[in-house]
Regions:
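Hydrophobic alpha-helical segments, chiefly the membrane-spanning helices
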Residues: 1-409
Length: 409
């Protein structure tokens, strides 16, 4: 927590664009170290719990950017960054995981990958994503974010971690499927193994802490040289850079095909992390900066941004309820994200492009919400399986709140 606060409190200094030449490889190395640690740790704690810790470490730079914007009371920019980061995760991250796994399947197995099938334990992440989305709907409806909301969102995340902590670790049979480094760690003596896992998490986190600011600063310099508007930078470039470590580790797993579900859950865990902890941090820092308990109000444009992001996450969650992500679902998420992304730098004005730029967010939002409503109707009518909820109920009875064995008479 102290490291996060120190990183977040630091101002993003101007650095030359060439800084990216050393900062980018350092971030890549950090992502690999943390990925190896999480891949090894899943055999001793629940995979979902390891991924939750991994997701938090990987998104430290995103927390830092949001901290600075909230401290400066830049409400339009901090909400733009939050919604941009979340839409990048679901609209670009999830489809890219499928794309990497599909390309690897074509290259290695000579056959197409029609879908990514989740493991049974992943039902916790799928159901865990729904809970904050329900509460965020209430936040959107009242058009503000306050300290009470922060408390509720933090409690939701704590409850999510408690559930994950009670899930069983991966079965030992999967150890031989690991690549050389994580497999060697898992097979090492207990004391050595634990020390190496902690050291990898710590080293990766430290590298992200030390390199995030210069990496972001170098991208800021490059964007300025290319004439990228500040709003576009804050909504798209900064989140992409701050989530870069996460994408590296997720794509590293996705290329193995068999670990594509783990890669996808890495992204879903980050969705939960940002809808809860990141959103909760904003009114806390904002209130401290103002010197009194304060509410972050939403204007009409910000309400639309939040609703569009909420709609996208709801559609993504709905896709995963049957415990798989099909090729057409990944393509749909990417297509809707790409449409509104392309029009982000276009200014509203006369002509067709100007008209579309002024209304595209509304059109995409309606598309998300309509898709969610129709998808929900299919589940209600029994035309699509709600496997995640059935499995979660089973996991709850088996691991979270197991029934005591009947007394022997």
């Amino acid at each position: 927590l102290c490291a996060l606060l120190l990183l977040a409190a630091a101002q993003i200094r101007e650095v030359p664009s060439t800084t990216a030449l050393w900062a980018a490889p350092a971030i890549l190395l950090a992502a690999m170290l943390i990925a190896w640690a999480a891949e090894s740790a899943q055999f001793f704690v629940a995979q979902g719990f390891a991924l939750a810790i991994l997701a938090w470490l990987q998104t430290l730079p995103e927390f830092a950017v949001e901290f600075v914007l909230a401290w400066k009371q830049q409400v339009p920019l901090l909400l733009a960054n939050l919604t941009g980061a979340l839409r990048l995760l679901t609209g670009l991250g999830w489809p890219m995981i499928y794309a990497v796994a599909a390309l690897a399947s074509r290259a290695r197995r000579r056959k197409p990958l029609k879908e990514i099938r989740l493991e049974e334990a992943h039902c916790v992440e799928v159901v865990g994503l729904l809970v904050p989305l329900i509460y965020i709907t209430f936040v959107w409806a009242k058009a503000s974010l306050n300290l009470i909301d922060a408390g509720v969102l933090i409690l939701i995340y704590v409850a999510y971690l408690i559930v994950l902590r009670r899930m069983p670790p991966e079965q030992p049979e999967g150890i031989e499927d690991l690549e050389l480094i994580p497999r060697s760690i898992v097979k090492a003596p207990r004391r050595t193994r634990n020390l190496v896992i902690v050291a990898l998490f710590a080293a990766g986190g430290a590298l992200i802490y030390l390199c995030a600011e210069p990496f972001l600063g170098s991208l800021l310099a490059i964007s300025a040289a290319l004439g990228v508007p500040s709003f576009v930078f804050v909504q798209w470039v900064a989140p992409f850079v701050s989530e870069f470590p996460e994408k590296v580790s997720a794509f590293y797993w996705a290329r193995t095909i068999d670990r594509a579900p783990m890669a996808l859950m890495n992204m879903v865990s980050s969705n939960i992390n940002q809808w809860t902890l990141l959103a909760a941090m904003l009114p806390i820092v904002y209130s401290i900066s103002r010197g009194a308990p304060s509410t972050i109000p939403f204007d009409q444009q910000q309400e639309l941004e939040i609703l569009m992001t909420l709609g996208q996450s709801l559609v993504g969650m709905l896709f995963l309820v049957n415990m798989k992500l099909a090729w057409w679902e990944a393509s749909s998420l990417f297509s809707l994200w790409f449409i509104q992304f392309v029009f982000s730098p276009v200014k509203p004005g006369p002509g067709l492009l100007g008209f579309l730029a002024a209304h595209i967010h509304w059109y995409v939002t309606v598309a998300y919400l309509t898709w969610f409503a129709l998808g929900l109707l299919r589940y209600v009518l029994g035309r699509r399986r709600m496997d995640a909820f059935h499995l979660f109920g089973e996991m709850w009875r088996r691991h979270i709140r197991p029934r005591p064995a009947p007394a022997v008479k």
